[in-house]
Amino acid sequence: MSKSFQQSSLSRDSQGHGRDLSAAGIGLLAAATQSLSMPASLGRMNQGTARLASLMNLGMSSSLNQQGAHSALSSASTSSHNLQSIFNIGSRGPLPLSSQHRGDADQASNILASFGLSARDLDELSRYPEDKITPENLPQILLQLKRRRTEEGPTLSYGRDGRSATREPPYRVPRDDWEEKRHFRRDSFDDRGPSLNPVLDYDHGSRSQESGYYDRMDYEDDRLRDGERCRDDSFFGETSHNYHKFDSEYERMGRGPGPLQERSLFEKKRGAPPSSNIEDFHGLLPKGYPHLCSICDLPVHSNKEWSQHINGASHSRRCQLLLEIYPEWNPDNDTGHTMGDPFMLQQSTNPAPGILGPPPPSFHLGGPAVGPRGNLGAGNGNLQGPRHMQKGRVETSRVVHIMDFQRGKNLRYQLLQLVEPFGVISNHLILNKINEAFIEMATTEDAQAAVDYYTTTPALVFGKPVRVHLSQKYKRIKKPEGKPDQKFDQKQELGRVIHLSNLPHSGYSDSAVLKLAEPYGKIKNYILMRMKSQAFIEMETREDAMAMVDHCLKKALWFQGRCVKVDLSEKYKKLVLRIPNRGIDLLKKDKSRKRSYSPDGKESPSDKKSKTDGSQKTESSTEGKEQEEKSGEDGEKDTKDDQTEQEPNMLLESEDELLVDEEEAAALLESGSSVGDETDLANLGDVASDGKKEPSDKAVKKDGSASAAAKKKLKKVDKIEELDQENEAALENGIKNEENTEPGAESSENADDPNKDTSENADGQSDENKDDYTIPDEYRIGPYQPNVPVGIDYVIPKTGFYCKLCSLFYTNEEVAKNTHCSSLPHYQKLKKFLNKLAEERRQKKET
């Protein structure tokens, strides 16, 4: 302000430069604009104010010419103190340039208001010749201007700038008048020197800073008198961003210099807002980042920041303002934006429409106000929802929406544990590719209690915070139409299968593994996969399974020198018998015999064969009745996928089959889809057939015409086929060098072969003795001798030496033909292969 008056004094003393505003670089209006950089109306106000100060002999005049302008500018502080003492502006320390410009503009406005003048008055005063304006006739000129303004009516009242001592109510000026003023300003400064600061069209700096300054001015009583304006002032004071949704330049400028501009923002409009406003109103996830909120003009750079923004109070208030500006627009009737709650993150990633049931009914203007929306996320404050959102509508939803979680093992268990303490879970839905989950509670109160709790307490999944709120789009999860009665039971069917990993490859029986789980409850079913060092044990109840998992989390489970990892299988929820009659009958039949089991007792070959005929893999002949019971249910064997689809009568019911994709969610919703865990993924080919199962379909097709005697020997053929499949699996693992990989490969691949060989000797020796006369000499093999190599013909040179029986490569011929061919695994596989050839030859003769 001091610089403005100093320049006015300079212009006063240099009469030759006073009227030529565009040519003189240090003229009256140009100098004021250079120091203030304000709109045209305030520039003319400063011009008139400077002229008033000069006429009233404020003690600032000095005889300076054009060359002395620089020294006059440096002495601005002295005259500034004089001005402050006269107009009681108060002494403030030196401010930054932008703050000083803004403060000087408002001080000039207050000075003019103290004289009862407006911007239009000063415009007319500036048109008077300077030689006709003297301190003597100035009061008469001002009175004449005021009388003329009174006669013309309120058209001269320009909001804050035109406020008189009587505090006339602000008048809404047509937009055309502002355009004229803008053009006048541009025309007045077209010839201005290039060194001067550029003129900004009606941009009065940051709205938040300007609003804070207005709150300190005497304009406060106007806002207190007018309730609506007070509410609008507080509304605009919360942010420093403008609207991009308005069409005209005047409306885009945000808050103007007074209540006039505030009221202009509430101008009613017809129709609906632009699509960008609608999308941001509904909280749709942006397609990319950074994203600019078209309602708040606020840039966001991530999903988390976007979620915090749309749940904040400032965004909510602007959504309410958008509804007031477009009274005819009903956001619930938008066909492309069916999100019911404009303040919640749009669940745009949900599967096909209608999966979770119809959205709740739309809310209308006639509903009663319900007060705070404190249960829909932090930052909402005490703001009422737009158009008085009914709390009853919130209560109708029973679906808890969980977002922003990270995937991991036992994801479903982790998610359900968040809400399980608050009530019964009736259904749930976990999306496959998107980190969103919906959990339906039995009652609305349970869902509301869970949401209220996590409003104040962070919800954690795998130790990372997640967002929990009540879904406003979906009231409940719809049951599938085809199987309404097959809905899973949370307590009895979900999560009953325990997954044991890092088991030893061999050296233990099935019963030894089962004894690990027996202390925690009754075992309903199990499957053991030695080649994959893992096992699945189904307990009778979920509580038993959870008890074992919880105990092993606190205290590590050690088995034969290995730390066994125990967790609840997320992949499989139960083990199902495809032929339940045989399996169940076998279980019931062996239960009574299990009690009378003696560790020293062994079964005769005939008894063991009756239980394991058709089994793909027999684990041990020394195991007791309990082992036989389980191996009869689900003997284990690695098979090819095509064979597994035909023959096994036991499978793991995988939740991976019920994964929710966006395209298939409608059909897969029944049992509460979840994301499978890769770590406990077990191929269906790992599941073996039942103990009393008939020969496999593949074997039956190959040997359909075999005689009864040949069918008795099918067990051996199956074992040989299993051997070949193991060889293929070993070959897939890559080429192995004899020095580095021979011991490990043979031991890992054939670790349980001694048991199988013993089993074979136990259950098949009598058959071999009976049928030895039918086996030609070329297919016979004597007893095993460690230092005598056999089957050397099967070791062939191929970039090394490859054993076709064991699927192993060797670079050294001596190691391959002597060391390897003298090994027990090689001998066992050769024996099985010769038995297979002999059986095929016999079948050909009989046919």
Curated annotation (Swiss-Prot):
Zinc finger map (Matrin-type): 801-832
Coiled coil: none
Residues recorded as bearing N6-acetyllysine in the entry: 3, 522, 571, 836
Region listing for Disordered, in residue ranges: 146-174, 187-214, 342-394, 588-786
Cellular localization per UniProt: Nucleus matrix
Gene3D superfamilies to which the protein is assigned, alphabetical: 3.30.70.330
Modified residues (Phosphotyrosine): 158, 202, 219
Effect of residue 85 to C: In ALS21; results in increased interaction with TARDBP
Stretches with biased composition (Acidic residues): 653-665
Record's disease association: Amyotrophic lateral sclerosis 21: A neurodegenerative disorder affecting upper and lower motor neurons, resulting in muscle weakness and respiratory failure. Some patients may develop myopathic features or dementia.
Protein name: Matrin-3
Species of the source: Homo sapiens (Human)
Gene for this chain: MATR3
